[in-house]
């Protein structure tokens, strides 16, 4: 791998400094172990001590989440080593990349789970990735993030990143938090959570939020609105427990898209969406007019509900069954650029000027305009998953056997394209005097579909662990999965099915690992695995010709890991060297265009470090150094994978102190990222950038907390992506501009 040598000195320096500091901790650290339990990556989710886990997993608790102040679920994933997140599109619609795995957008190698169950079995559909249907609030107690490891064998078989969000639980004590948050962009948000005991051994937790704002990029109207309500009930039994929950969400926000990078005044605060253009009329199918409100943006209106049963049976057997039902609408409305900025005189019918269709303003020929597509995607989704497992511990052997089943459906109605010219300014209006603006066909291409799809997955898996010596543990896992898809699509909204799919495939995934304990608080692990990303509905639509030619559209993922771990009294340090190969990756730049079929490789190392001192100082560091390469491609062999940074680093120091008799914490985050290529051709360079965040927490009285948090303090104008639909257009999507939030909360 070509670039890895350039970063080896950085990686070596980080490893040397952090590991030396870790080893230097006193003997007390070896007696006081951090009993952090992780359930991700374990058969049936029984759980294992983090120090004993032979894989890379990161835990982020509610206290850390509060300090990170993420703007979305995907934004929180930036704190996970090995993960590159583009969260600049708003609360929904993030792009998440895992350890150099290829991707052109969305999050094909991310699974979001709640209480151990996937919220939606398909990691990504067009215009939908898992984080889009999950909202953070005060009901979350912990997030686990497992990369690689045994992932291909358990749960939905995700070979990349599985995040598991755990809900807060009730106890014998009644506890609660009420929190109000506002901001410099007009955010009004109220969070609440309450937990306690309903009766003997029956516990509850209820909570949620209500929010409204005009958006970090001010649209001039309430472009972000939402509410969520969660109930979590737990009944403790003599030999186990029963847990049920439901999470009801209705939350939408503006969809932020690439903007011209070569026009003055268009920066990180800019959004084309506004009062003068949120309403539009488009024509779909047989020239049927449709009135739309682009202000609805992207969102989720639905529920994620489920539960689990955990039992300790006779003869040392354990039983666990986890289930989940997800239903709702994940719609998308947006103003999507259809090319770069142009001068009005070059597109006006008279070659001189044009009139605003809303205000009647006459715009001169030197006014910048841009063709904008009015895109509509209506998506109804539903899924049901069940993961049942039996396990037993013998003298030196642990065995688990499980069966995972999933039923997944999606019904889509799209109208893409519908382009018209708008004045290039915040909230800029459409123009009269440009012929294509009023034509049924619009000013560019159009793509309309009506589709329905159902998928079924049935997998049998087993994991076996053998303690060869007091220090050495070996494990193996196998998974046999059958995946079926039935899908049809009408691509012209004329009632004729152009593409129909009746698909079935079976694959066997595996993992082999070894964990060696160097000391009670220190160890190393090694692992290899092979897994698969099975195709879902849009994979067939995008690659229908390839599918008809006999390609099963399955991405084959092979990984190897070598890791070091240390967990002392006040220091945690994890370093993981990873290597992976992904065969059969497909990339479609725009619906209707031919697919590119690629093989990608990545080699890298990730660091996860936490230090806490009795003086009140704490530091978290996560860093990733990686080299990616396209090893098989018709045109791009030898290039780097698009949108993948060679290195990134994130440092979060925090200091607790007394301020005028009050407990206080000052904290901040410095993050930096390397240059990236915006396309697989490596012709578009996205420059690296640095970002600073700063926050202060003050507790003037018991239970009362005041917090102020500044994001992007220096107002860095970083770019996360170019224009993936038109790489030649000088467009790009900025990171979010500087914003400041203030909250006051009371806990009891």
Language-model regions, residue ranges each:
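C-terminal beta-signal and adjacent terminal beta-strands/loops
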Residues: 671-679, 697-748
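Acidic/polar loop-and-plug regions of large Gram-negative outer-membrane beta-barrel proteins
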Residues: 230, 234-236, 241-308, 331-375, ...
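N-terminal periplasmic "start-of-domain" segments of outer-membrane beta-barrel proteins
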Residues: 35-68, 93-95
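Extracytoplasmic beta-strand/coil segments of soluble accessory domains associated
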Residues: 49, 74-118
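N-terminal periplasmic accessory domains that precede
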Residues: 73-76, 95-97, 112-113, 130-133, ...
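Short acidic/polar hinge/loop motifs at secondary-structure boundaries
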Residues: 118-147
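Gram-negative outer-membrane beta-barrel transporters
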Residues: 469, 572, 577-582, 588, ...
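Transmembrane beta-barrel wall of Gram-negative outer-membrane proteins
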Residues: 175-177, 181-267, 297-300, 304-313, ...
């Amino acid at each position: 791998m070509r670039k890895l040598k350039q970063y080896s000195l950085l990686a070596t320096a980080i490893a040397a400094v952090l590991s030396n500091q870790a080893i230097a901790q006193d003997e007390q650290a070896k007696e006081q172990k951090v009993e952090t339990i992780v359930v991700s990556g374990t058969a049936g989710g029984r759980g294992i001590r983090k120090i004993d886990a032979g894989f890379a997993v990161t835990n982020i608790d509610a206290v850390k989440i509060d300090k990170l102040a993420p703007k979305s679920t995907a934004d929180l994933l930036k704190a996970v080593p090995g993960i590159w997140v583009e969260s600049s599109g708003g609360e929904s619609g993030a792009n998440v990349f895992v350890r150099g795995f290829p991707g052109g957008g969305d999050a094909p190698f991310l699974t979001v789970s709640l209480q151990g169950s996937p919220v939606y079995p398909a990691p990504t559909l067009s215009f939908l990735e898992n984080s889009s249907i999950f909202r953070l609030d005060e009901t979350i107690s912990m997030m686990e993030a497992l990369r690689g490891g045994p992932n291909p064998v358990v749960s939905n078989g995700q070979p990349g990143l599985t995040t598991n969000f755990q809900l807060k639980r009730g106890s014998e004590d009644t506890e609660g938090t009420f929190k109000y948050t506002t901001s410099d962009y007009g955010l009004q948000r109220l969070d609440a959570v309450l937990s306690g005991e309903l009766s003997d051994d029956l516990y509850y937790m209820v909570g949620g939020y209500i929010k409204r704002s005009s958006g970090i990029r001010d649209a001039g109207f309430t472009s972000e609105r939402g509410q969520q309500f969660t109930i979590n009930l737990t009944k403790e039994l003599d030999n186990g427990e029963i847990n049920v929950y439901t999470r009801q969400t209705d939350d939408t926000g503006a969809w932020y898209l690439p903007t011209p990078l070569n026009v003055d005044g268009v920066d990180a605060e800019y959004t084309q969406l506004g009062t003068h253009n949120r309403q539009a009329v488009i024509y779909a199918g047989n020239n049927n007019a449709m009135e739309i409100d682009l202000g609805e943006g992207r969102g989720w209106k639905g529920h994620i509900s489920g539960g689990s049963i955990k039992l300790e049976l006779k003869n040392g057997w354990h039983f666990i069954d986890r289930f989940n039902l997800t239903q709702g609408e994940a719609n998308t409305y947006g103003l999507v650029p259809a090319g770069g900025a142009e001068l009005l005189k070059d597109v006006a019918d008279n070659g001189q000027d044009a009139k605003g269709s809303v205000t009647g303003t006459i715009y001169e020929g030197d006014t910048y305009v841009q063709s904008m597509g009015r895109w509509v995607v209506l998506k109804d989704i539903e899924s049901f998953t069940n993961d049942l497992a039996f396990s037993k511990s013998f003298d030196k052997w642990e065995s688990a056997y499980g069966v995972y089943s999933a039923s997944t459906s999606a019904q889509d109605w799209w109208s893409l394209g519908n382009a018209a010219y708008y004045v290039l300014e915040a909230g800029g209006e459409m123009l009269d005097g440009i012929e294509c603006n009023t034509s049924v066909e619009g000013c560019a291409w159009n793509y309309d579909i009506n589709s329905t799809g159902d998928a079924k997955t049935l997998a049998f898996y087993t994991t076996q662990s053998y303690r060869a010596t007091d220090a050495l543990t070996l494990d193996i896992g196998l998974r046999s999965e059958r995946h079926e898809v039935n899908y049809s699509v009408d691509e012209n909204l004329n009632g004729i099915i152009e593409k129909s799919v009746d698909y079935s495939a079976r694959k066997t995934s595996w993992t082999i690992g070894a964990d060696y304990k160097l000391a009670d608080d220190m160890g190393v692990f090694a692992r290899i695995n092979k897994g698969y990303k099975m195709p879902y509905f849009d994979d067939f639509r995008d690659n229908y010709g390839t599918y008809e030619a006999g390609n099963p559209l399955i991405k084959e993922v092979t990984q190897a890991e070598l890791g070091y771990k240390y967990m002392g009294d006040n220091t945690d340090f994890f370093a993981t060297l990873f290597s992976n190969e992904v065969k059969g990756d497909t990339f479609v730049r725009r619906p209707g265009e031919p697919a590119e079929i690629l093989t990608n490789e990545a080699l890298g190392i990730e660091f996860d470090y936490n230090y806490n001192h009795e003086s009140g100082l704490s530091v978290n560091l996560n860093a990733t150094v990686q080299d990616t390469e396209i090893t098989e491609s018709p045109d791009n062999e030898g290039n780097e994978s698009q949108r993948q940074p060679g290195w990134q680093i994130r440092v979060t120091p925090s200091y607790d102190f007394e301020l005028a008799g009050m407990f206080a914490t000052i904290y901040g985050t410095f993050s930096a990222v390397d240059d990236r290529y915006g396309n697989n051709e490596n012709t578009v360079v996205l420059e690296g950038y640095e970002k600073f965040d700063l926050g202060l927490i003050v507790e003037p009285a018991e239970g009362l907390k005041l917090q102020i948090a500044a994001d992007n303090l220096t107002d860095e104008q970083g770019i996360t992506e170019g224009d993936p639909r038109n790489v030649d257009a000088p467009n790009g999507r900025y990171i979010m501009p500087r914003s400041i939030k203030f909250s006051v909360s009371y806990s009891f």
